[in-house]
């Protein structure tokens, strides 16, 4: 569930006037980045992402594993090797049985990679974390945008299958 929905009473809402947490992809308010610095934002994001993986809420897919890359072209690119954090995320997703969404949103928003970035997707592949695909479409014209290229990208990162959800709640693994 999203912040503020049933079962998530303890989840901080970043969009309230009294919130001190902010949000990492709000381009109207960069105080989180300015206060914590790039490394601090990354570390907090990875910790929170792993806590979400470990949640007892009923969901299967973790999306935007490296949304933290959103402002990399605006002066907030990591000045450190993120691989240890990526490995932590891959281990957490694997150990909790979560799938990861490969999203076409990043290239659509002008970034040079996908969500997750190539290095992180390779870590997920190495850890045998299942994947599914999405486009994070907020408009009809973006549904399945660049999806074939995203599938080829996943193949290049080591994946040979991806999972498709069914209305029954079951998942089907299919070849790339």
Kindly give the residue locations of the regions a language model identified.
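Charged catalytic cores and adjacent phosphate/nucleic-acid-binding surfaces used
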Residues: 5-11, 20-21, 75-176
């Amino acid at each position: 569930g999203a912040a503020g929905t049933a079962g998530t009473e303890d989840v901080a809402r970043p969009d309230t006037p009294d919130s001190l947490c902010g949000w990492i992809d709000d381009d109207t308010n960069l105080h989180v980045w300015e206060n914590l610095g790039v490394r601090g934002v990354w570390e907090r994001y990875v910790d929170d992402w792993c806590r979400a993986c470990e949640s007892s809420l009923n969901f299967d897919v973790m999306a935007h594993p490296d949304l933290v890359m959103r402002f990399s072209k605006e002066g907030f690119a990591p000045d450190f090797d993120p691989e240890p954090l990526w490995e932590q995320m891959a281990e957490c997703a694997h150990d909790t049985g979560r799938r990861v969404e490969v999203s076409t949103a990043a290239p659509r928003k002008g970034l040079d990679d996908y969500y997750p970035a190539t290095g992180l997707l390779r870590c997920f592949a190495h850890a045998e974390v299942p994947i599914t695909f999405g486009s994070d479409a907020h408009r009809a014209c973006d549904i399945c945008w660049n999806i074939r290229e995203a599938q080829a990208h996943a193949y290049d990162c080591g994946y040979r299958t991806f999972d498709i959800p069914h209305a029954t709640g079951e998942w089907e693994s299919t070849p790339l």
